[in-house]
Swiss-Prot record:
Zn(2+) 2 binds at C159, C162, C186, C189. The gene is Dnaja2. The modification Phosphoserine is found at S78, S123, S394, S395. The modification Cysteine methyl ester is found at C409. One of its GO terms (molecular function) is zinc ion binding. A zinc finger (CR-type) spans 130-214. This is DnaJ homolog subfamily A member 2. It comes from Mus musculus (Mouse). GO terms for cellular component: cytosol; membrane.
């Protein structure tokens, strides 16, 4: 005899735990024929047991779970649904879903309601300085007039059509010895499992058991919080009878800032300076996220290259829950060059004397051809006239393989 944790399902089919697949199928067909509702209307529950037992034992994975861990293995390994809760309750005692430990159940075993997610837009200043704000929400709460019963005491009756389950189980025969079990929401009680006569319904909630209520939440946005971070209000979501309320979850959405961009705890900004500032030093002031006026100085004689980045330590974002520690501020410099012909030609020689010497031009032996540099507008394409057309006569394959994006000046 095979060593298994539980034999109840084998006993239902009347086979030993070591039964083969053919033995299981043979036993199932014999019992299904004997207890089919069309032939034996009073044996509906027995037929469900037989179908369930065969469904588990004919599936190698489910059978292995059942053989090794018994009923508990099926409870923890099953996803539920399809009327499984009723069958488990009938065969083993206690529903399937009470053992699942998933999000639909709270720690105390009560069914748990859904969480309510709301976006909360915040500025970068809010995330830097912290902020307290009030948020108005509408949610369902239990009716105080009927204490969430929907009517006066004793008026609520179990739905006779679905026996209080909220769903109806239907069995459809697919072929001789093969059936399909289906469930649908009970139309008599709209899936609630209960019915209330219209004359006995609560006047305040009209039998719905809940009413709408406006809730004001005080929201604390702490310093250093980030885009996508969540603020949770436990148990503040919609209420329902016999259900533990879910949570209200606020999802922070950072609005774009006109000066700063955030990267973790660091801040980035771009600042434009002129050529004279890049060569001779500069000083500028900007307003930080906490309204402080920050003065940035750069000494004469130290050159700022176009596109280079300098850092100011400790002027980034505060760390979440450790606001006295801050990230850094990175400033990228956009050096603005003067317009064409900005200086009198007579002064150019004086300027050249002040700048570093030109590199020596090597002597070229042989014939040379002088060309002219022209302005290039990248938005209008490369042009090129006939020379470009001739160049494009090469095959598409060669073109796609070797013609990458044009080389651009590198800025560091």
């Amino acid at each position: 005899m095979a060593n298994v944790a539980d034999t109840k399902l084998y006993d239902i089919l009347g086979v030993p735990p070591g039964a083969s697949e053919n033995e299981l199928k043979k036993a199932y067909r014999k019992l299904a024929k004997e207890y089919h509702p069309d032939k034996n209307p009073n044996a509906g529950d027995k037929f469900k047991e037989i179908s369930f037992a065969y469904e588990v034992l004919s599936n190698p994975e489910k059978r292995e779970l059942y053989d090794r861990y018994g009923e508990q293995g099926l409870r923890e390994g099953s996803g539920g649904g399809g009327g499984m809760d009723d069958i488990f309750s009938h065969i083993f005692g206690g529903g399937l879903f009470g053992f699942m430990g998933n999000q639909s159940r709270s720690r105390n075993g009560r069914r748990r309601g859904e969480d309510m997610m709301h976006p909360l837009k915040v500025s970068l200043e809010d995330l830097y300085n912290g902020k307290t704000t009030k948020l108005q929400l509408s949610k369902n709460v239990l009716c105080s007039a009927c204490s969430g019963q929907g009517g006066k005491s004793g008026a609520v009756q179990k739905c006779s059509a679905c026996r209080g389950r909220g769903v109806r189980i239907m069995i459809r025969q697919l072929a001789p010895g093969m059936v399909q079990q289906m469930q649908s929401v009970c139309s008599d009680c709209n899936g609630e499992g209960e019915v209330i006569n219209e004359k006995d319904r609560c006047k305040k909630c009209e039998g719905k058991k809940v009413i709408k209520e406006v809730k004001i939440l005080e929201v604390h946005v702490d310093k250093g919080m980030k885009h996508g971070q969540r603020i949770t209000f436990t148990g503040e979501a919609d209420q329902a009878p016999g259900v533990e309320p879910g949570d209200i979850v606020l999802l922070l959405q950072e609005k774009e800032h006109e000066v700063f961009q955030r990267d973790g705890n660091d801040l980035h900004m771009t600042y434009k300076i002129g050529l004279v500032e890049a060569l001779c030093g500069f000083q500028f002031t900007f307003k930080h996220l906490d309204a402080r006026q920050i003065v940035v100085k750069y000494p004469p004689g130290k050159v700022i290259e176009p596109g280079c980045v300098r850092v100011v330590r400790g002027e980034g974002m505060p760390q979440y829950r450790n606001p006295f520690e801050k990230g850094d501020l990175y400033i990228k410099f956009d050096v603005q060059f003067p317009e064409n012909n900005w200086i009198n030609p007579d002064k150019l020689s004086e300027l050249e004397d002040l700048l570093p010497s030109r590199p020596e031009v090597p002597n070229v032996i042989g014939e040379t051809e002088e060309v002219e540099l022209q302005e290039f507008d990248s938005t209008r394409g490369s042009g090129g006239g006939q020379r470009r057309e001739a160049y494009n006569d090469s095959s598409d394959e060669e073109s796609s393989s070797h013609h990458g994006p044009g080389v651009q000046c590198a800025h560091q």
